[in-house]
């Protein structure tokens, strides 16, 4: 842990097309090796694909993020030689970051032919509470439920 204290939360400018901070954060998480224009093409392409099937793409993205975001997660805590998986609540900013990360990871593993289509399909699935990202959230919740007995080790 840093001795200099915590760093301040950076403000993300809203994206130019939709004027949404959520989409701007999503673009930044899709980005690899600083290639922001490629990430923008992927996210905007996915939003266009969703827009063809659904009326409001931003609402669908928000619904998908809400469905995927975890309420609890487990953290390792070492107590007297034993390591316990202690369930802890997830704060709002981490909840959104995890939801975005899981959506992107599970969309990259999908079988469609292009990344915008993969991302669009995963977002559509997540908005209807199915898909790889939802499985990841359910698995996290199951782990927390199974280790509920160690909740008193919370810090």
Swiss-Prot record:
Identification of the protein by name: Small ribosomal subunit protein uS7
UniProt feature coiled coil, ranges: none
Keyword RNA-binding assigned: yes
Disulfide-bonded cysteines: none
Organism: Xylella fastidiosa (strain M12)
Entry keyword set: Ribonucleoprotein, Ribosomal protein, RNA-binding, rRNA-binding, tRNA-binding
GO BP field: translation
Any GO CC annotation of this UniProt entry: small ribosomal subunit
PROSITE patterns on file: RIBOSOMAL_S7
PANTHER family xrefs: RIBOSOMAL PROTEIN S7
Role according to the record: One of the primary rRNA binding proteins, it binds directly to 16S rRNA where it nucleates assembly of the head domain of the 30S subunit. Is located at the subunit interface close to the decoding center, probably blocks exit of the E-site tRNA.
Gene behind this protein: rpsG
């Amino acid at each position: 842990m840093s001795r200099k204290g915590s760093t301040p939360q950076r403000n993300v400018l809203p994206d130019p097309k939709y004027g949404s901070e959520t989409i701007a954060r999503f673009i930044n998480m899709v980005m690899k090796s600083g290639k922001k224009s490629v990430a923008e093409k992927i996210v905007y392409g996915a939003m266009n694909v969703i827009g063809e099937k659904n009326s409001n793409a931003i609402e669908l993205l928000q619904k998908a993020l809400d469905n995927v975001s975890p309420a609890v997660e487990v953290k390792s805590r070492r107590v007297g030689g034993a390591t316990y998986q202690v369930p802890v609540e997830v704060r709002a900013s981490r909840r959104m970051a995890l939801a975005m990360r899981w959506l992107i990871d599970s969309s990259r593993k999908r079988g469609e032919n292009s990344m915008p289509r993969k991302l669009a399909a995963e977002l559509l699935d997540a908005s209807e509470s199915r898909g790889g990202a939802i499985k990841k959230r359910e698995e996290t919740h199951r782990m927390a439920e199974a280790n509920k007995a160690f909740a008193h080790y919370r810090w």
